[in-house]
Structures are given as C-alpha cells and as structure tokens.
C-alpha cells in the first residue's frame, strides 16, 4: 500500500504517477511492466517511487484494490436501486461492466480491471482474488442486500 509520503503528495502528483502505472499495467503483462517506464512517464526520480511504494507488486496491488473499491460503489448503487435484490442487481452490474469497455482505463475505472485481466491471463485464474478481502466486501454489502429476498437458513449464510 502507498506510504504516507505518497498520500501526502498533491493530488495532481499522485494522479500523474498512478496514471502512468495504469497505462503500463494495462498495456503490458505484469511480468513485463517496468518501474523505469512508469517513473519516466510520471516524470519522477526512481528513488521517489520507492519512497511511495515498496515495489511493483505494491503499486499493482494498490491499483487493483482501488479499482475494486470503485466497482463496489457502483454495485452498491445498483443494489440500492433494486431494493437490495442481489439477483436483480447482477444483470444490471453485468450491463454496466459491458458498457465500460477495456478502453476506459482511467484510474479505478472498470475498463482498467478488464484491461489488466486481459493482459494477464495467468491472473484470471484467481491471482487477482488474492488482492481482495472477501470479508470486507461482505461487510460493505451488508447494508445494501435485502436478506428477506434470499432463502437464508442462518444469518451466517450471507457470509458475515
């Protein structure tokens, strides 16, 4: 995760580095992505990069988690619009994702995740899931899901 030094940077400086990283990770597979290209495009010294993130994986993890958070916000809005009906919300979420193609690779945008998955075939098989904390997602969804619309036998059946 980013250091406090990074979080204290001016937003435009953060955006510059993150935009360069998004471009790098969406244009190349993770194992070919280069910190040198990222810092060159962002216009920062390589040493500064290491003051902000431990390594390439740390930056990649941050980008993926930020993108997932953005998608959760969208899903929460869809769920609320569907009165907490998960099964009615899923097709809407699918439509949302299809309407935001991989070309929409802005920071945290759904296209970013799509492009990263497409560039990293090995990650599709669950590698990205290691960056996700399911219990936090479930906690966040708790207020949005209407349990009365589900066939729950125990409160724990929802996962929290």
Region roles according to the model:
Residues 62, 77-103:
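Hydrophobic alpha-helical connector segments
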Residues 27-30, 51:
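Helix-turn-helix/winged-helix DNA-binding modules
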Residues 69, 88, 117-160:
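Amphipathic alpha-helical packing segments from all-alpha helical-bundle domains
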Residues 65-72, 76:
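Short, basic, alpha-helical segments at the C-terminal edge of helix-turn-helix-like DNA-binding modules
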Residues 43-52:
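Short hydrophobic/aromatic patch on the recognition helix
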Residues 55-60:
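Short amphipathic alpha-helical segment with a characteristic S/N-K-E followed by hydrophobic residues
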Residues 1-28, 36-37, 41:
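Basic, helix-initiating cap at the start of DNA-binding domains
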Residues 53, 64:
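DNA major-groove recognition helix of helix-turn-helix
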């Amino acid at each position: 995760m980013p250091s406090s030094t990074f979080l204290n940077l001016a937003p435009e400086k953060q955006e510059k580095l993150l935009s360069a990283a998004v471009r790098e990770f969406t244009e190349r597979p993770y194992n070919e992505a280069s910190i040198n290209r990222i810092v060159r495009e962002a216009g920062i010294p390589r040493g500064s990069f290491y003051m902000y993130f431990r390594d390439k994986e740390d930056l990649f993890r941050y980008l993926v988690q930020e993108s997932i958070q953005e998608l959760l916000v969208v899903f929460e809005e869809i769920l609320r619009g569907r009165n907490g009906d998960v099964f009615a919300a899923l097709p809407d979420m699918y439509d949302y994702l299809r309407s935001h193609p991989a070309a929409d690779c802005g920071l945290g945008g759904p296209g970013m995740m799509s492009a990263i998955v497409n560039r990293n075939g090995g990650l599709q098989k669950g590698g990205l899931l290691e960056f996700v904390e399911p219990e936090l997602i479930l906690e966040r969804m708790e207020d949005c899901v209407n349990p009365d619309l589900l066939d729950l036998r125990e409160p724990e059946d929802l996962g929290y």
